[in-house]
């Protein structure tokens, strides 16, 4: 067997093996997406209900709570960045990190100091490779988030938000994540988590669904109880959307890799056939030449 033909056959074999691996990873991601989407949908009723409740209490009671009051001057901002633990998900993590860098630039241009909190190995590796500091990182499974992790993140952010500036506290909290819209569309998104912003539209919708309340205890105590749960619900919903987006991105990336592997196998097969035909032609030519030499002698 010719050297060139042997190389092509080795490439066909290795590409077929990689193609099987990519196909298996595509099927695994596909099977897990439905569960991830179900978890996103299951988290929405509670998240929407507590958002409406907080909006109504904050707007109708006319109180000034630290978590809902805009500070006179914002000197330090916290940014929570959600990426994946593993690769093979296309540009999923890179897109989130790009969005985080843009937000970082905007905040610093406004004269704000930035404290960064990370979720996922990809974000941690990105910052460590560039020798950039971050406050804290969580590397729990990003494609199957747990509520306990959301509670831990919420507690950390709320504690820093409650601290004074001189004690390394923050004045506002932003979250950078990938919003899951559909299997085809996942959008890197930035939201400001705190101070809580209550839009007129939210208040109007909430007023239609929730009556005016008489508060016992005082509205401040109600908000003290509701707001931590609101933050936990928002962060958990964000983590679930990021997980669904990660799996969708990985499914697309593995499908593309599987298709490319199949195309490469076809290409190498054609090249191997061409090389084999050339080898056979050369052998026939040598046989004919040898026969002619014998006849001539």
UniProtKB/Swiss-Prot annotation:
Subcellular location: Cell membrane
Molecular function as annotated in GO: ATP binding; proton-transporting ATP synthase activity, rotational mechanism
Name by which UniProt lists this protein: ATP synthase gamma chain
UniProt lineage: Bacteria, Bacillati, Actinomycetota, Actinomycetes, Micrococcales
Similarity annotation: Belongs to the ATPase gamma chain family.
Origin: domain of life: Bacteria
PANTHER family, per the entry: ATP SYNTHASE GAMMA CHAIN, ATP SYNTHASE SUBUNIT GAMMA, MITOCHONDRIAL
Binding partners and assembly: F-type ATPases have 2 components, CF(1) - the catalytic core - and CF(0) - the membrane proton channel. CF(1) has five subunits: alpha(3), beta(3), gamma(1), delta(1), epsilon(1). CF(0) has three main subunits: a, b and c.
Function: Produces ATP from ADP in the presence of a proton gradient across the membrane. The gamma chain is believed to be important in regulating ATPase activity and the flow of protons through the CF(0) complex.
Gene3D superfamilies associated with the record: 3.40.1380.10, ATP synthase, gamma subunit, helix hairpin domain (1.10.287.80)
Species the sequence originates in: Renibacterium salmoninarum (strain ATCC 33209 / DSM 20767 / JCM 11484 / NBRC 15589 / NCIMB 2235)
One of the record's GO cellular component terms: plasma membrane
Alphabetical list of InterPro entries matching this protein: ATP_synth_F1_ATPase_gsu (IPR035968), ATP_synth_F1_gsu (IPR000131), ATP_synth_F1_gsu_CS (IPR023632)
Encoding gene per record: atpG
Membrane-protein topology: Peripheral membrane protein
HAMAP family: ATP_synth_gamma_bact (MF_00815)
